[in-house]
Amino acid sequence: MRNSQTVAALGAFRQQARISHTIANNLSNVQTAGFKRDVSVFNSILSQARNRFQNVGNDTSKISFLPGSTQRTGNALDLAIEGDGFFKVKTTNGIRYTRSGNFGLNKDRVLINAEGLPVLGQRGEITLNGKNIVVEGNGSIKVDGNEVDRIALVTFPTLDALQKEGHTLFQSPSPENETAADRSEILQGALEGSNVNPIQEMLSLLDSHRTYEACIKIIQSDDTLDSKAVNEIGRV
């Protein structure tokens, strides 16, 4: 019969797969502008085994919204946010939020993000007809000296409810709770980099592997005890 340690260890295999996937996804987005790393919160399998819990451990994933480093690009349509604000983009499924500001213009000169989604201003989609484009800290967009719109910057009372969609988009289950990000500023000609620290992720991966190896030992130990028990019964 499997004891509590082995039951927990078996469950940990599935958890380790999810954790490894999370780490791999973080590492693959080290160079993705505005990417926010996922953090796996894993209840140690060894701790559970020592306490003889019957249930396998729980692991949850949360998003780290710590800012990435600001990188100067010199591109007039690259925008970085200083503060806790988000850009708004329009998708076929509704409004989404992002920190990734590597924008461009489509054939109709509508401001779009890297995925081709329209970036929203206070008046809706932003069309930029002109040559000299200036974006001020408060989001005001001037084309050839004339203000055409102001980029919508919003935030939420808490970011815990935001859900990832793809690599750099976020969905809010309660978009009505968005408020103007008055304390945030836009920096033109710059991008916010990913907040992934490759060294930290590799250390997390090593820790995950150590937990995996510990699980192996627990299961092997239990199998050895089972084998001995069967042999003893066979001698009776």
List each model region and its residues.
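Amphipathic alpha-helical polymerization modules
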Residues: M1-V236
